[in-house]
């Protein structure tokens, strides 16, 4: 790798003994050595240094391949920066690095976060474990390949939790929602707590360390659904069962069982954990924050889910308890040499308990522990073990039982979950131990590191393959990249024969082999191997140089731990156990051992398992997750550099970086390269060159070689980036000096101008003072002249005004006298005319009133007489049920006669009106004649007055004294005429008084008649109710008769008797006839004929309903803004009284019609049409219907059209125009406004119809809202991030800054304008269909809430969106939405603009300047009061200024936010920083009813199909 180009002033990284790497500034260069002044003030001289990127984002980068300098200190600093911001995930290409936060971060693992990452390409959102899972799942679905996810890291790095999150996400993608019972994904997820209970334990480095490796194969069918799974485990740490060190713990299951409920503890004969030898070797019995009792119950529940029955669970925990009792069996020396016996009673008691739990003989168990049987050709020898060997036998038995119990649990889980032989593909999740290097490394560490060597080789090949694919994709020339291959280490370990494992197996097969002989064999075999070494101070230790460093192994227990056999006495003991579960474990083992006669060791079997694992991984597309433990104290907020670097090396991350650095470590997109280094060649930017050509010209100008230009990126060798940065720093330094020079020049010029301006101001002041003195003198002289002139004018004007006032007073007195005389004459004349007019009008009105009252009294008397007669006839007819129908027919005939008489009365009344009109015309002619005479007299008087005025004026011209000229004759005649008129006036006044008395008496009589008429009206109502009840009885009797006739027809074939029934015809309401119909049929009797059959009532009603449904199924539009269909349905239902019946089908048929119209409907116009109709109809029902316990009981004054003909005629009498003068007889028509709608006590079908209609209204509303969301959602993806401007903008932006800042370019807001266009389209559609403004405002309110949620969540999940320029872009788009809200008016938008409060405040925070000066209180109370502390913390840590280079809020504010977020995380149930979309219904029926204006139902014209039918003539009625 070429040395980076460094100049004085460059910032570099140098090694530090405390921080691993520290940054500083180069102060001097001496050959290959540089002098660096670190940030601590210390000067370091070194030749090992790396350039530092001073322009790196303050919050780090989410993909370390984006680092300008890809080296160890850059990677370490980037991880540390992101860890401080709680950004625990970081990409390195396709590799995910996960740093354990050691605290709960539930908000990034909730279901809504899974929804965000579902189907999103890798790298589009912030790094996350869900993104890796989604990438594997999408690759499997799209390419049909098997995929695997390898999770690695040292103990405590978070591998187990990461694996659980991966499995949760895969179950979320491939799960089956709504499936009853145990699903495959549930069983896979619940297998984790079971395996953790039996395979995890507390270690020095981790409270929940997995002591085994695990590979989970999740199988998927062709639809991408989980169809099966298999779990493979590797190398369980068996020695932990018997031996633990302080402060570690044994496996969790032992402590869980000791914390079980009291009944279980009694059942398994357990005590406190500190009383068991296998547990009390350590002082740690409990874990912080873990309740073993609840974990025990949770484990039992998980075992139920994975398919382990209650009997099997009981057997499992009996075995676990037996192992604890086995550990408490101690041995003492026996009587014989090298023999042993049970030490004491306590040990004997535990022996008996263990035997009881294992259901075997206690003596047999004792013999199996302390005796061995040796078979020779001559005899069978039984020998006793000494106490030490007996303890070893006990421990061996415990380890054997536990390991096979663990294997049984794994096999049971696999059997329960089941594997799908027809699965299309799999995703494997590998959770395996990371590289280990301790002070004491035994056989377990040897196997673990062997595994990691295998995985590292696979990892290196994968990284090399990714590099090769990147170069091939960009179509650049590349050569082979060398990388360290660890094949020699693998051969050292696994070569057969001659490898360490082979030599270990060989030593195990010889009984006399020891660890010394085994070590000597290794030293002799590998003394020349580069990767093998012998420590100087040990005879049995050996050292292997792994890829992550040298590890020294202690071979003391290699042979013992490698042996995989079971003692024959142990096997015989448990095979004879009465417990089928225990016997089954050892029986299966016996079958396996009998099938294989070769020697089997742990190492060989592990090597075979590892070989099988690598074959599986090689057949899949791998995805890597490297887990990092930031510190060894397991606390949050601590980042230990040396510890992390060691793990990066062990995890192969630095090796992957080294492979990248061996090729082209720096890769920049053309746009980014020009944006950063375009200033090195300004003439290139000013030219109209393609981006690729421009980049080529810049590199050629700087004489760089050995770089590559791909299709979209530039690939630079190591060191070339530093060289370009050095030249860029030089250019920027020169530019800074030019700016400083120009600034100093500007300051000097500014100082000179200020001095000059001060002198000018002083001179101006002095000249002004002189000018003001001269001006004052001239002003005094002018004022004196002005005073003299005004005084002379005042004296002359006062004399003139006095003369003029005297003249005016004289003239005014004369003219007033003349006017008063003329006014008196006119007032007398006007009074006479008014008296005459009132007297004549009173006479005419009195005559008309008498005629009207006489006619009404006559009509009322006659109607009362007829009503009484009909009542008597009805009472007589009611005594005989058989004659009831005849009475009804006669009654209807009588009513017909009354109708004819009514016509006659109308004609008489018309004649009276005509006579009255003629009389009034005569009176008007007489009045007109008198007015003409009055005008002539008035004209004569005026002429005489004019002549008198002329004479007076002529006389005044001769003589100044006034002369009064009197014509005595005329005055006398006028006086006589006035006297005569006064006499007439007095006589007329006397007559008027008499007429007034007569009028008062007539009013009294009229009131009496009104009371009588009101009493008659009440009686008529009572009669109508009686008739209605009788008619209902007739209808019920007719129904019974019909049923009887049908039964008779089924018995007898003859039906001739039915032909003798009287025939009736249907009389409908027409403009020529004044009869009525209510949609059902009204029948009038006619002469009986046998030619015209009668239609049944139900059939006719069915036809009317069919016609109504056929009409509303079409789009019949609107009438003056009112939905015709809703008004039509409402009027028909009211007229047919459908709301008041117990059973009817019309409601269900209307609902079915609406459902068929909107089913699978994508046309917004149709949905809005039915939304308007449904809302209007619901408004009618809300104001009309009221729930009642009985039938449709309404007040007589407000009931609808009666069903009988007599009732309808009576109702028409009360509502006739002739009765307009009597309010108590005026009926209420259904055609009035909503204020006149009558209240109906609805039955159950009507109330159910209202509920169904409400449900359909909400459904249509939801369909319109979801359709709008579907249209807007694709546009929002382009609205959250500013589109990249073309390269020409880099130049034009410098010269046209002002204009671009004022008005955003049209292409930049095109996506926002598309949203506005979509909103306008839907608004026009809803307004064209007269959708209520409340519903429109609610729709747009929820749409704006959806926009707020989508934009805000995207902003929090994508760091590239949290930039200054992106904030300006979104703010410009929001301004477009605000303008649209203003144009659409508040009536239709409501509070929609307020729904964007989260994104508005977030964007406002992004674009404010001087963020570091803002305190947390100012941010939370003034800038962003709506945002939560988690959301503010997320935005503050992700913010980066790509325009001005400013920083986010201060570190103190960040620290305070982090502390508050931590507190909230501990206390809150859900502390997700993401918003949830609200899909509820935001209105109620009362809201709709209150918001809608009154609708005149009667003013709506029915469609032609209805208008042409005579049964619907009631729809043509109009309200007065």
UniProtKB/Swiss-Prot annotation:
Residues 1062-1100 are annotated as: Disordered. It is found in: Cytoplasm. GO terms for cellular component: cytoplasm; myosin complex. Residues 1076-1086 have a biased composition (Polar residues). It comes from the Eukaryota. Transmembrane segments: none annotated. SUPFAM superfamilies: P-loop containing nucleoside triphosphate hydrolases (SSF52540). Signal peptide: none annotated. It holds the Pfam family Myosin_N. Residues 881-1047 form a coiled coil. Residues 59-729 form the Myosin motor domain. Disruption phenotype: No visible phenotype. Residues 732-761, 755-784, 780-809, 803-832, 828-857, 851-880 form the IQ domain. Its main location: cytoplasm. ATP binds at residues 153-160, 206-214. Belongs to the TRAFAC class myosin-kinesin ATPase superfamily. Myosin family. Plant myosin class XI subfamily. Homodimer. Interacts with MYOB1 and MYOB2. Interacts with PHOX1. IQ domain mediates interaction with calmodulin. This is Myosin-5. It comes from Arabidopsis thaliana (Mouse-ear cress). The gene is XI-1.
């Amino acid at each position: 790798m070429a040395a980076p180009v460094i100049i004085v002033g460059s910032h570099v990284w140098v090694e530090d003994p405390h921080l691993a790497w520290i940054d500083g500034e180069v102060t001097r260069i001496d050959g290959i050595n540089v002098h660096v002044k670190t940030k601590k003030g210390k000067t370091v001289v070194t030749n090992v240094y790396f350039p530092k990127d001073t322009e790196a984002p303050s919050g780090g980068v989410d993909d370390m391949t984006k680092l300008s300098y890809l080296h160890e200190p850059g990677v370490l600093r980037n991880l540390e920066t992101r860890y401080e911001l709680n950004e625990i995930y970081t990409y390195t290409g396709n590799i995910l690095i996960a740093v354990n936060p050691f605290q709960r971060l539930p908000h990034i693992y909730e279901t809504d976060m899974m929804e965000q990452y579902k189907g999103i390409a890798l790298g589009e959102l912030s790094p996350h474990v869900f993104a890796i899972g989604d990438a594997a799942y999408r690759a499997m679905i799209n390419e049909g390949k098997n995929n695997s996810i390898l999770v690695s890291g040292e103990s405590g790095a978070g591998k187990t939790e990461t694996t659980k999150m991966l499995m949760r996400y895969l179950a979320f993608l491939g799960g089956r929602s709504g499936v009853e019972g145990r699903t495959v994904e549930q069983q896979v997820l619940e297998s984790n707590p079971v395996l953790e209970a039996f395979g995890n334990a507390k270690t020095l480095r981790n409270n929940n360390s997995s002591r085994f490796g695990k590979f989970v194969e999740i199988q998927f069918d062709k639809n991408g659904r989980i169809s099966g799974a298999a779990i493979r485990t590797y190398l369980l740490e068996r020695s932990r069962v018997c031996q633990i060190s302080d402060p570690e713990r044994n496996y969790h299951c032992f402590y869980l069982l000791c914390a079980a409920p009291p009944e279980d503890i009694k059942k398994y004969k357990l005590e406190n954990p500190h009383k068991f030898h296998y547990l009390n070797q350590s002082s740690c019995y409990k874990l912080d924050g873990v309740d073993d009792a609840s974990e025990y119950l949770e484990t039992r529940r998980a075992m139920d889910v994975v398919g382990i029955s209650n009997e099997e669970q009981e057997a499992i925990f009996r075995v676990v308890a037996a192992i604890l009792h086995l550990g408490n069996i101690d041995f003492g020396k026996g009587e014989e040499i090298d023999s042993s016996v049970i030490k004491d009673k306590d040990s004997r008691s535990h022996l008996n308990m263990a035997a009881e739990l294992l259901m075997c003989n206690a003596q047999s168990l004792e013999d199996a522990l302390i005796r061995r049987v040796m078979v020779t050709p001559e005899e069978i020898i039984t020998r006793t073990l000494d106490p030490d060997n007996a303890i070893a036998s006990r421990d061996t038995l415990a380890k054997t039982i536990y390991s096979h119990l663990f294997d049984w649990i794994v096999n049971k889980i696999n059997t329960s979950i089941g594997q799908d032989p027809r699965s299309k593909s799999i995703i494997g999740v590998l959770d395996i131990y990371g590289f280990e290097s301790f002070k004491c490394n035994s056989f377990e560490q040897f196997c673990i590191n062997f595994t990691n060597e295998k995985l590292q080789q696979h990892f290196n090949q994968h990284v090399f393959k990714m590099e090769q694919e990147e170069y091939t994709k960009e179509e650049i020339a590349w050569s082979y990249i060398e990388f360290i291959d660890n094949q020699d280490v693998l051969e050292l370990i696994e070569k057969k024969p001659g490898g360490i494992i082979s030599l270990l197996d060989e030593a195990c097969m010889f009984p006399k082999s020891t660890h010394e002989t085994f070590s000597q064999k290794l030293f002799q075999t590998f003394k020349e191997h580069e990767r093998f070494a012998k420590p100087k101070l040990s005879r049995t230790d050996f050292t292997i140089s792994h890829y992550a460093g040298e590890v020294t192994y202690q071979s003391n227990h290699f042979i013992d731990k490698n042996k995989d056999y079971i003692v024959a006495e142990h096997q015989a003991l448990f095979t004879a156990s009465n417990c089928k579960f225990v016997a089954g474990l050892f029986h299966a083992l016996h079958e396996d051992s009998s099938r294989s006669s070769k020697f089997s060791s742990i190492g060989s079997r592990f090597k075979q398992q590892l070989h099988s694992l690598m074959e599986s991984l090689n057949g899949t597309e791998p995805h890597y997750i490297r887990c990092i433990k930031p510190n060894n104290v397991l606390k949050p907020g601590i980042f230990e550099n040396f510890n992390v670097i060691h793990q990066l090396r062990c995890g192969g991350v630095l090796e992957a970086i080294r492979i990248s650095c061996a090729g082209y470590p720096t890769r920049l997109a053309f746009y980014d390269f020009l944006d950063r280094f375009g200033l090195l060649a300004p003439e290139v930017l000013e030219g109209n060159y393609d981006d690729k050509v421009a980049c080529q010209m810049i590199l050629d100008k700087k004489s760089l070689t050995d770089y590559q230009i791909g299709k979209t990126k530039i690939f630079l060798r190591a060191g070339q980036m530093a060289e370009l940065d050095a030249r860029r720093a030089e250019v920027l330094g020169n530019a800074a000096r030019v700016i400083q020079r120009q600034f100093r020049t500007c300051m000097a010029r500014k100082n000179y101008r200020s001095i000059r301006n001060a002198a000018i101001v002083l001179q101006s002041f002095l000249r002004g003072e002189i000018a003001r003195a001269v001006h004052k003198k001239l002003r005094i002289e002018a004022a004196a002249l002005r005073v003299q002139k005004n005084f002379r004018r005042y004296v002359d004007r006062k004399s003139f005004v006095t003369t003029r006032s005297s003249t005016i007073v004289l003239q005014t007195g004369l003219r007033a006298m003349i006017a008063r005389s003329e006014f008196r004459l006119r007032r007398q004349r006007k009074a006479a005319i008014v008296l005459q007019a009132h007297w004549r009008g009173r006479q005419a009105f009195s005559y008309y009133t008498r005629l009207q009252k006489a006619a009404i009294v006559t009509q009322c008397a006659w109607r009362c007489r007829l009503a009484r007669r009909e009542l008597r006839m009805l009472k007589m007819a009611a005594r005989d049920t058989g004659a009831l129908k005849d009475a009804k027919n006669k009654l209807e005939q009588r009513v017909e006669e009354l109708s004819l008489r009514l016509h006659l009365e109308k004609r008489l009344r018309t004649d009276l009106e005509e006579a009255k009109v003629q009389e009034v015309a005569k009176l008007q002619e007489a009045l007109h004649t008198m007015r003409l005479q009055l005008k002539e007299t008035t004209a004569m008087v005026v002429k005489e007055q004019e002549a008198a005025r002329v004479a007076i004026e002529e006389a005044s011209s001769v003589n100044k004294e006034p002369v009064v000229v009197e014509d005595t004759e005329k005055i006398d005649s006028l006086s006589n005429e006035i006297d005569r008129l006064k006499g007439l006036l007095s006589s007329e006044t006397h007559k008027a008084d008499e007429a007034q008395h007569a009028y008062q008496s007539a009013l009294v009589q009229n009131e009496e008649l009104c009371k009588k008429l009101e009493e008659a009206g009440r009686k008529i109502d009572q009669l109508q109710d009686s008739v209605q009840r009788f008619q209902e009885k007739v209808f019920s009797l007719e129904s019974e008769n019909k049923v009887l006739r049908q039964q008779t027809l089924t018995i007898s074939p003859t039906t001739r008797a039915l032909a003798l029934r009287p025939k009736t015809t249907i009389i409908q309401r027409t403009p020529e006839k004044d009869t009525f119909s209510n949609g059902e049929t009204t029948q009038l009797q006619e002469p009986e004929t046998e030619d015209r059959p009668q239609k049944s009532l139900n059939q006719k009603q069915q036809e009317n309903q069919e016609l109504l449904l056929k009409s509303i199924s079409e789009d019949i539009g609107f009438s003056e803004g009112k939905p015709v269909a809703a008004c039509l349905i409402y009027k028909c239902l009211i007229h047919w009284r459908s709301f008041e019946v117990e059973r009817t089908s019309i409601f269900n048929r209307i609902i079915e019609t609406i459902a068929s119209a909107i089913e699978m409907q994508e046309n917004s116009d149709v949905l809005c049409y039915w939304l308007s109709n449904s809302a209007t109809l619901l408004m009618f029902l809300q104001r009309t219907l009221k729930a009642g316990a009985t039938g449709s009981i309404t007040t007589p004054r407000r009931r609808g059209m009666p069903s009988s003909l007599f009732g309808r005629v009576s109702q028409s009498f009360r509502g006739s125009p002739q009765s307009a003068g009597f309010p108590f007889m005026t009926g209420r028509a259904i055609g009035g406004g909503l204020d006149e709608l009558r209240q109906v006590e609805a039955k159950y079908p009507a109330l159910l119809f209202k509920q169904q209609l409400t449900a359909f209204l909400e459904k249509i509303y939801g369909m319109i809202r979801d359709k709008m969301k579907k249209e807007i959602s694709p546009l929002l993806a382009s609205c959250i991030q500013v589109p990249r401007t073309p390269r020409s903008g880099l130049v034009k932006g410098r010269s046209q800054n002002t204009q671009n800042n004022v008005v955003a370019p049209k292409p930049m807001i095109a996506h926002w304008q598309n949203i506005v266009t979509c909103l306008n389209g839907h608004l026009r559609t809803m307004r064209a269909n007269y959708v209520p403004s409340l519903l429109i405002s609610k729709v747009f309110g929820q749409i704006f809430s959806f926009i707020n949620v989508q934009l805000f969540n995207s902003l929090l999940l994508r760091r590239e969106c949290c930039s200054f320029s992106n904030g300006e872009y979104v703010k410009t788009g929001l301004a477009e939405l605000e303008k649209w809200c203003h144009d659409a008016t508040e009536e239709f938008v409501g509070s929609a603009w307020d729904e964007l409060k989260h994104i508005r405040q977030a964007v406002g925070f992004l674009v404010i300047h001087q963020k570091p000066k803002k305190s947390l209180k100012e941010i939370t109370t003034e800038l962003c009061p709506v945002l939560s502390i988690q959301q503010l913390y997320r935005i503050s840590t992700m913010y980066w200024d790509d325009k001005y280079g400013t920083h986010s809020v201060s570190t103190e504010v960040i620290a305070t936010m982090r502390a508050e977020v931590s507190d909230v995380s501990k206390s809150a149930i859900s502390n997700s920083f993401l918003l949830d979309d609200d899909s509820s219904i935001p209105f109620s029926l009362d809201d709709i009813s209150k918001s809608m204006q009154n609708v005149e139902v009667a003013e709506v014209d029915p469609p032609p199909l209805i208008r042409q039918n005579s049964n619907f003539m009631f729809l043509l009625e109009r309200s007065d």
